[in-house]
UniProtKB/Swiss-Prot annotation:
Segments passing through the bilayer: 23-43, 45-65, 93-113, 117-137, 145-165, 171-191, 216-236, 241-261, 277-297
Membership in a protein family: Belongs to the UbiA prenyltransferase family. Protoheme IX farnesyltransferase subfamily.
GO CC annotation terms, alphabetical: plasma membrane
The protein's name: Protoheme IX farnesyltransferase 1
Membrane disposition: Multi-pass membrane protein
One Gene Ontology biological process: heme O biosynthetic process
Reactions mediated catalytically: heme b + (2E,6E)-farnesyl diphosphate + H2O = Fe(II)-heme o + diphosphate
Pathway: Porphyrin-containing compound metabolism; heme O biosynthesis; heme O from protoheme: step 1/1
PANTHER family recorded: 4-HYDROXYBENZOATE SOLANESYLTRANSFERASE, PROTOHEME IX FARNESYLTRANSFERASE, MITOCHONDRIAL
């Protein structure tokens, strides 16, 4: 009985792992920010709860499809070889059915508790990641994460539209921030895992163009990100608190990118990658804090 229960727990954990919960949580932080930034009043509990649940379920479904498509690649890479599908703990067909169930439930929640525009934009984001990026771009071009990054940048727009019911310039600016953040984030990881990507025949930029070229582009994109991150203040979407945070966080990110560009230290790339995660989290928290500070004035 104890053995049977441990197997069941492992299966439950395997299916949870397929949804990439840590990635989904970061996405939901940005969708939450989009929701709260969209209004001067409070967000209704139904939109807050079921809107984010729907977005999260669809994101989880897309992540499962990514695991299915990449299972052979994952088996070749040290970072991913222990994933459930790569090790055969979950079969592809049950995983795809699980992905379909997550996506359908997410779409139903969005249609019922938010609005049709949010649901269709979420579906477009899901298909962009699961089909366009995972199925084609990842194996086709070293610009895979630049082109495919738009799908991963959508959550703040989805959260905003869930509350407002329409697309406007402000949420598109939030999308632009994540879009500019994506290349330095993933290319830093790609440098750290260059040999693994080469072994799996994935044309990541460090594999196709070399580390020096990639480091230069990380530096350039970090400069672009710093400039883009100041636009919410420039258009009076945010105030001085956000400006100070964006400058501090952005300059620190630029420092990491410069160190990576100038240094051959083996841990510089993974250090840049880890900082980029904290950067995005802190930047969106700053947006929220500034928003409610402005409302209280």
């Amino acid at each position: 009985m104890a053995t049977l229960l441990s197997v069941r727990r492992a299966r439950w954990r395997d299916y949870l792992e397929l949804t990439k919960p840590k990635v989904v949580v970061l996405m939901l932080i940005t969708s939450l920010a989009g929701m709260f930034l969209a209004t001067r009043a409070g967000v209704s509990w139904s939109v807050l709860l079921f809107g984010n649940l729907g977005i999260g379920l669809c994101a989880g479904g897309a992540a499962v499809v990514n695991h299915v498509v990449d299972r052979r690649i994952d088996a070749l890479m040290a970072r991913t070889h222990k994933r459930p599908l790569a090790q055969g703990r979950v079969e592809p067909l049950p995983a795809l059915l699980f992905a379909l169930a997550l996506a359908l439930l997410g779409m139903v929640l969005l249609l019922v508790f938010t609005n049709a525009l949010t649901a269709w934009l979420t579906l477009a984001s899901l298909l962009g990641y699961a089909v366009l990026y995972t199925g084609f771009l990842k194996r086709a071009t070293p610009q895979n994460i630049v082109i495919g990054g738009l799908a991963g940048a959508a959550p703040p727009l989805l959260g905003w539209v869930a509350v407002s019911g329409h697309v406007s310039a402000e949420p598109l600016l939030l999308v632009l921030i994540i879009f500019a953040w994506t290349p330095p984030h993933f290319w830093a990881l790609a440098i750290h895992r260059k040999e693994e990507y080469a072994k799996a025949d994935i044309p990541m930029l460090p594999v196709t163009h070399g580390e020096r070229y990639t480091k230069l582009h990380i530096l350039l994109y970090t400069l672009i990100l710093l400039a883009v991150s100041l636009l919410p203040y420039a258009i009076h979407m945010s105030g001085p608190l956000y400006l100070a945070c964006a400058l501090g966080l952005g300059l620190r990110f630029l420092h990491w990118a410069w160190v990576l560009y100038r240094s051959s230290r083996p841990h510089a790339a993974i250090g840049t990658f880890k900082y980029s995660i904290g950067y995005l989290f802190a930047l969106f928290i700053a947006l929220l804090l500034d928003h409610y500070l402005l409302l209280s004035l």
